[in-house]
């Protein structure tokens, strides 16, 4: 293939476009709601949008630091040239904390074992003590908190760690009226008092992620850890954020079929009337949930049309309807599977709803390994393949 032909292929295939200006706008919108700092949580490849692209766009919107759930992600930020503070939580106790500290990465400490490991491997490391504020997931159980704070203070006096933060996390922030939120807030306030009482002076006190930041100022403290909100997901439904993703693909073929034509694996759908079927070269290997057939809609030739039959590994069938005057779609036309919703196209929230999942799950599953990824905004357009963090042009 000539370079021109390659380029042609590249511009007409399935394409996931990431508009990083949405990320910047979202951070700005969130910053207007809180006096605290914004930590951009760019775990899971920036919620499937691209770690470095989301990180850069978040800084442009006023985020001042990063949060990740593995040291690998922290190093990826450093390798990409980001010098801001990075906090990593969820690290196994035998992680390379020495390497983390040398890279200037702050470490969450959910208990004595982590504290000992950090003190041994990375004397002087900056740590955030992590309190379980009601999830029974990550963080020290409240009954171990006092002891953890005192042990940490002793380690700090001996020069083994510096406790720069205290963190908690709310289980039910997406439901602002849920009683667990009040309990979580009180537990966190207690946790901070205990830390201060033990002689610790944590400058960073953080409880809120996106939903709590948007819906409850009492959770704000000195900083918010924002992940979903970066990419336009607001579970609390209280603020209008902007989605950054658009997935498009060409119609490979359009065919006319008679009434009674079964479609796809398992023949789960049969055409009730003569109709036209369009074939879209995107499927569950690209992150579309297989079960979304017959509930999902896509936009083609300006109208919403239903997905029919089961979604296959790399293709999806759309019922274009019998009437070309209503949906004048032809082979080669671009189908929008989702976008920010500006022109009536579905959004990733619609897709998540159609399969009964969270938008977070839907967006983090997208993209590997076939979708071409294009980043737009901030005066750059770059191309690459998702899942590889690659960008061919910059
Ligand atoms: C993922 C995560 C966040 C970010 O949460 P969002 O709701 O996506 O903003 C914050 N804190 C912790 C501990 C997390 O694991």
What label would you give each PLM region?
Residues 42-44, 70-71, 110-112, 131-133, ...:
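Fold-independent oxyanion-binding glycine-rich loops
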Residues 256-394:
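C-terminal accessory subdomain/extension
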Residues 177-274:
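Anionic-ligand-binding alpha/beta catalytic cores of soluble enzymes and soluble regulatory domains
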Residues 23, 77, 209, 251, ...:
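Divalent metal-coordination and catalytic microenvironments
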Residues 140-141, 215-216, 254, 318-320:
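Short beta-strand-to-turn element immediately C-terminal to the catalytic PLP-Schiff-base lysine
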Residues 105, 203, 222, 226, ...:
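Structural beta-strand/beta-sheet cores of well-ordered domains, especially the beta-sheet scaffolds
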Residues 32-34, 100, 121-122, 128, ...:
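Solvent-exposed alpha-helices and their adjacent loops that cap or buttress functional pockets
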Residues 5-10, 14-25, 36-206, 220:
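Active-site-proximal beta-alpha core segment in soluble small-molecule metabolic enzymes
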